[in-house]
Swiss-Prot record:
Organism listed in the record: Arabidopsis thaliana (Mouse-ear cress)
Every ABC transporter domain range: 346-582, 981-1219
CDD domains: ABC_6TM_Pgp_ABCB1_D1_like, ABC_6TM_Pgp_ABCB1_D2_like, ABC_MTABC3_MDL1_MDL2
InterPro entries (alphabetical): AAA+_ATPase, ABC1_TM_dom, ABC1_TM_sf, ABC_transporter-like_ATP-bd, ABC_transporter-like_CS, P-loop_NTPase
Alphabetic keyword roster: ATP-binding, Glycoprotein, Membrane, Nucleotide-binding, Repeat, Transmembrane, Transmembrane helix, Transport
Spans through the membrane: 22-42, 69-89, 145-167, 171-193, 251-271, 283-303, 667-687, 700-720, 781-801, 805-825, 881-901, 920-940
GO cellular component terms given for this protein: membrane
SMART domains in the record: AAA
Gene name for this UniProt entry: ABCB16
Glycan attachment positions: 529, 593, 628, 755, 827, 1001
Protein name, UniProt field: ABC transporter B family member 16
Database matches in PANTHER family: ABC TRANSPORTER DOMAIN-CONTAINING PROTEIN
Amino acid sequence: MKTWGSMRSIFMHADGVDWMLMGLGLIGAVGDGFITPILFFITAMLLNDFGSFSFNDETFMQPISKNALAMLYVACASWVICFLEGYCWTRTGERQAAKMRERYLRAVLRQDVGYFDLHVTSTSDIITSVSSDSLVIQDFLSEKLPNILMNASAFVGSYIVGFMLLWRLTIVGFPFIILLLIPGLMYGRALIGISRKIREEYNEAGSIAEQAISSVRTVYAFVSEKKMIEKFSDALQGSVKLGLRQGLAKGIAIGSNGIVYAIWGFLTWYGSRMVMNYGYKGGTVSTVTVCVTFGGTALGQALSNLKYFSEAFVAGERIQKMIKRVPDIDSDNLNGHILETIRGEVEFNNVKCKYPSRPETLIFDDLCLKIPSGKTVALVGGSGSGKSTVISLLQRFYDPNEGDILIDSVSINNMQVKWLRSQMGMVSQEPSLFATSIKENILFGKEDASFDEVVEAAKASNAHNFISQFPHGYQTQVGERGVHMSGGQKQRIAIARALIKSPIILLLDEATSALDLESERVVQEALDNASVGRTTIVIAHRLSTIRNADIICVLHNGCIVETGSHDKLMEIDGKYTSLVRLQQMKNEESCDNTSVGVKEGRVSSLRNDLDYNPRDLAHSMSSSIVTNLSDSIPQDKKPLVPSFKRLMAMNRPEWKHALCGCLSASLGGAVQPIYAYSSGLMISVFFLTNHEQIKENTRIYVLLFFGLALFTFFTSISQQYSFSYMGEYLTKRIREQMLSKILTFEVNWFDEEENSSGAICSRLAKDANVVRSLVGERMSLLVQTISTVMVACTIGLVIAWRFTIVMISVQPVIIVCYYIQRVLLKNMSKKAIIAQDESSKLAAEAVSNIRTITTFSSQERIMKLLERVQEGPRRESARQSWLAGIMLGTTQSLITCTSALNFWYGGKLIADGKMVSKAFFELFLIFKTTGRAIAEAGTMTTDLAKGSNSVDSVFTVLDRRTTIEPENPDGYILEKIKGQITFLNVDFAYPTRPNMVIFNNFSIEIHEGKSTAIVGPSRSGKSTVIGLIERFYDPLQGIVKIDGRDIRSYHLRSLRQHMSLVSQEPTLFAGTIRENIMYGRASNKIDESEIIEAGKTANAHEFITSLSDGYDTYCGDRGVQLSGGQKQRIAIARTILKNPSILLLDEATSALDSQSERVVQDALEHVMVGKTSVVIAHRLSTIQNCDTIAVLDKGKVVESGTHASLLAKGPTGSYFSLVSLQRKVRYV
């Protein structure tokens, strides 16, 4: 019953058309299987005709011609049958897979957020089902199932013919089926287990490579290249060992197929007894022997394909389970109350809540909160106090464990979920955008909005100006997850998306956190206006977003401890007051440096002219540097001619295995024609009249067949193991060298779209795998095939050159037929992969942004996108289905026609006295088997083409010269640096936007041992200063000096050992907290006490020790298991452990709440003592105590001095204007 349920899961997506296609396909597959046994029957009669020839027989050609004509009739029938098989299965496979992907993704988007927290550990889980699972089932339906049916019917048909012709021999041969099945089943089981382990081993190595490449700035800054490559190499060693085991298993399995020769030997011996004792003809005996071995082999292939049944069952059940799952909070459920009018009054009554993924942690304990309609309520509190949980519960991402949440006195549990969410607009702290245009992203908020409404929403969110500056305006593509936009730009698009919805309830979770102060002021005014008449819930660190709130609620340990207006709470002098005083203390003495316009009067022009974030420029301009530099680096522009000779040179350390492998392949290749030649001789023996001669010759050939079986076993093991050894170690060497080389490239190379982390990791995985296949499998097959062809042609030309020439002339037809059939299947697979790749991208994006999709109820919009991306591949697949049917039919019919020609022409030569029957028997089998071997090798042309591209890709990477050499042998290696930094007349523009100059004749002196703050508006070049100091980029003109020496003259990795960087967005690696802190030192020998001290100094020790595993807590992919503030503190601890001479802080405390920021800032100021420090920050707390503050504007330093001296300049000073503007934004 369970098996039937599993089978139903495979076919559950079939409709009436699909069942009709599968019915016709069944007829075709079964018919295809019976074609070969029918041809065997005709061949038996032909061989008997040839064996009974006498020179006086004038009627010899009549039965030959008659049977050859019968073969042509079979050829015509086979075209129709094989067309049905090829077309119907291919078509229904694509149709069912497309419906499966659509239904699965729809079911995924239907699930509640709690499901993703509990059951989806990573996006790849969903991608696997959308891509791999659907592809497994499509491949099963299109290829594996018809193959199973065809082979099963071929087995039945062969034994039917065997019993019809010679039942005694068939019965004797029947038990040998078991011996024919064992090798395939044995290898199949071993291969599945080893292949799974190899994937798991390489996934670990691939994860290390992906981390290194996606976080390349962090890897470079902490000089962790060697550490990453060593980890990568260690991880690869496991897959190498498994690959050798796989090669050995393959050699044993293929060698065990030599049992066919032994079975043939026994059956020919028994068949000789049938000839002598019962008078059976030689053609009948030899054909029945072929039927027995062919039938057993066909059954083995059918059974070996049954593992695909199992894989398809598992994939189908996994998909079916998701499709049938009804979530607890079902957005598709249209039942539920819809309020005719909604005021927006929100009430939390005695709410207790635990997250499904953390049931041991109580977030709310008896929470009571009332939010009047049309009022703005701000939620404040420490990290983990439950602020964001309020919003999640209100949107019904989760349901509380106890208590009720009401809107207008109606429980939200009784409301229709989709309608409920449609009444809310949400802007999150980390905006989620989709890989489509800006306009389409804004329309996610309201699908039927007009373009004018889109523009108005963009204007209201202060996004219209920067959108208009793009060449394509609102049609500008934002890239995957908005990668082409800066943080502030993404946030403003997200705000526009929320405003266009005109929601009754507005939810703002750090909605302005990514904006500079000028943009924040304008956007905050827009949000304030949008809040009028709406119930608004605000979560924010900055006071500017909560001071004007009607009600401020202070959360602590899951309860509201204070509530009231700002003034009322200040009078209470409680927890809120302490938070305000803490922030005021810092705001009164310092100024924001990255976000503010220079003067209030100059703000508008700055906003219009400088509306790009430096990180946006860093991303978008760097690729132009590659373009410009490529003019002077020919190898980057000109594709290499693939050098297979050079590839072989990389395999030189394995030369002994190469020699052994080639010798074994040559000997193995000779086996097939020798076996066919011997079989032909044995057939001619059957037609001898002298029984003693039959016995004597049979004994010789039987011993020869047994010898070939043993010989094949040992040469196959030697061949497969040797070439696997070559392939595995070459693959490991290529991957190591590629990653090592990639981690020397300048940063702007990684900013190229084609050099994304995903693309590079794909190159590491796929290109190296193709090269391994090229060396480990294809070269082995090529050497073996060359040996086969040479031996076959030599034997043929010696025995009967006329017949041999004709046989050779038709071989290309057979080869082309096999080749087209194999290549066509590969092309079909490629089309399927294209469809699933597009679906996978969409699924990955949808799962990554599931909260956004859930918030805006955008499931149908995503499904329309899926329909759009699958439309092209679906049309192409329909065309390919016709081609598959036509070519499969043509292949089978042409092969049958060539057999008819060979029999007819051989008979003609015998009738004319130009060849004897014995020669025909010897040569016919040789070229029949050789043609198939050549065809198998012929399919390598696509593999060779693919291999050529991969070899080209590999050497393009290995031969590329980086423009910023990290291991320059002539570079100055320093033991210690003082830290004096000088920028002298520096010109700089990011490569992707060479016309937008960041620095123009820029000069600044950063004194050793002193702290220097860099402030100024967006795009003034603050972060670029750090990029140039770290030498992520080089200036176009001018010099950057450290300790009086041009930075380009230093040994770069040696220089970076003395610098440390803490970025705005902390990068952690998938490892433990301890391992991430240890990245601060190149050495792996670090005392535990040093790690703990670094954690304490960074204010991280307390939260780390509160975790169940302490410093051994796993951080997750990119630190996903930790909050932003926790990640930042670990990053700071990593920097503290490095103890650098130059400290670079780019928004180092931006992710921390006020209390944590104060402690960490004290720690940083302690660490900064005696070090050259360059500080960039939005918050004033990080620059108020700096020795020097430099104000940048339009790529130049317009003011510098201490905080006090710059304020003393009064209203005419740029810095004074920044301070004034900030105070206005903070306190208005």
